[in-house]
A protein has these predicted regions:
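N-terminal membrane-targeting/anchoring modules of bacterial envelope and secretion proteins
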Residues: 1-249, 258-259, 272-291, 295-298, ...
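Asparagine-centered strand-capping/turn motif at beta-strand->loop junctions
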Residues: 257-265
Length: 370
């Protein structure tokens, strides 16, 4: 009887204690739709109001919890607030009002979360199912980068618990914008195989905001096209300069400039593709370019026939994968190859002989008729 009583008491104790622990844990999410554009400026100043003590993101920091508290935070939001705190610009050039508000919000966040559990969402808070279908490897990047950024801003280690379980919502990104996302993602992935720069990794992670459920139709279109512009500018920092050249002999060397505007050295190769058979040229093997510098290559060409042609110059990595868009080298061949000359003279001579023969026949035929 005593054993039964003890068992009943134990069950009653478990019933009241375990749910209480769950009930006393407050989960606070700090997420927001993106405000910062891919060039670093801000679309508007709406985030300032959200960060105020009375705002959507400020209130949770002022509320005293009744028990334990778990914070679920998007590192992309902290990056935006940090950019505001350091001094920021609006895209429309209007005065900003949120620098001090952002500074105070970050300081308050570090203080109130210091003893609490913090879980980092995948960077940019993307739709998890859509990210898995689009690029599983990028979702892993979003998760690790999101963790890195939250730890950086809070200046401490946080829970290694996956934020995938905390992500909710469905993105309504249409097929056209999904295709643009994929193209930009692939372009930055290829660039990162050559350029090991923080800004390339950051921009690659920032593409996750395009998959965010927090964006409405207008926002999705705006940020998708803004991302394409930003990625194009980043790709242009490593480029082959287009140009016009003339070859006046059977062989000649063309000076082609390759520029690296990143703060890190890179190793690249260049694939050269003539669009017709007037010239022949070989690809350029891998070579190094220093940080923020340019290299001029002297590329040998062999001319086959006179006339104009275009050669596509494409930067590649060591595996031969294309990096960035191709540049156009306009080549004008002005010399006559001896083989072409012999062929032309021979053809003219044959035409002359044929015409002379035809004339003789006509004269003879005329005499016979008389």
């Amino acid at each position: 009887m005593r054993k039964i009583s003890s068992l009943v008491l134990a069950l009653i104790f478990s019933f009241f204690t375990l749910p209480q622990a769950v009930a006393d844990t407050t989960v606070t999410k700090l997420i927001a739709k993106p405000h910062q554009l891919f060039d670093g400026t801000f679309r508007n100043d709406e985030l300032t109001n959200d960060l105020l003590p009375t705002g959507r993101l400020g209130k949770p920091l002022e509320t005293k919890p009744k028990g334990l508290r778990t914070w679920v935070i998007d590192g992309a939001l902290l990056d935006e607030v940090s950019a505001m705190a350091a001094g920021y610009q609006l895209n429309n050039k209007k005065p900003t009002t949120g620098q001090q508000v952002a500074q105070e919000w970050l300081s308050r966040l570090k203080l109130v979360t210091s003893g609490d559990k913090v879980v980092a969402l995948p960077y940019g808070n993307p739709d998890i199912d859509l990210a898995k279908r689009s690029a599983p490897s990028e979702l892993r990047l979003y998760s690790t980068y999101g963790l890195e950024r939250v730890e950086f801003h809070l200046n401490r280690k946080i829970s290694a618990e996956s934020g995938l379980n905390w992500s909710t919502g469905t993105s309504k990104l249409n097929p056209l914008l999904r295709k643009k996302y994929t193209q930009n993602r692939q372009a930055l992935t290829a660039l990162s195989s050559i350029v090991n720069a923080p800004e390339v990794k950051a921009q690659r992670a920032k593409l996750a905001v395009l998959l965010s459920p927090s964006l409405d139709k207008k926002d999705r279109e705006f940020f998708s096209y803004n991302a394409a512009e930003g990625v194009a500018q980043t790709l242009n920092r490593l480029r082959v300069s287009s140009g016009k050249y003339q070859i006046a002999s059977e062989t000649g060397k063309v000076p082609v400039t390759v520029t690296n505007d990143f703060d890190v050295p890179v190793k690249v190769a260049v694939k050269l593709t003539p669009l017709n058979s007037r010239v022949q040229v070989s690809n350029v093997a891998e070579f190094a370019i220093g940080a923020n510098s340019r290299t001029q290559l002297s590329i040998p060409f062999t001319a086959i026939a006179p006339g104009a042609t275009t050669v596509l110059a494409q930067i590649t990595n060591k595996d031969g994968e294309f990096v960035g868009p191709a540049s156009k080298l306009s080549i004008n061949v002005t010399f006559f190859d001896s083989r072409v000359t012999y062929f032309t003279v021979g053809a003219a001579l044959l035409l002359f002989i044929a015409a002379f023969t035809q004339t003789i026949r006509r004269i003879r035929r005329g005499r016979h008729e008389k």
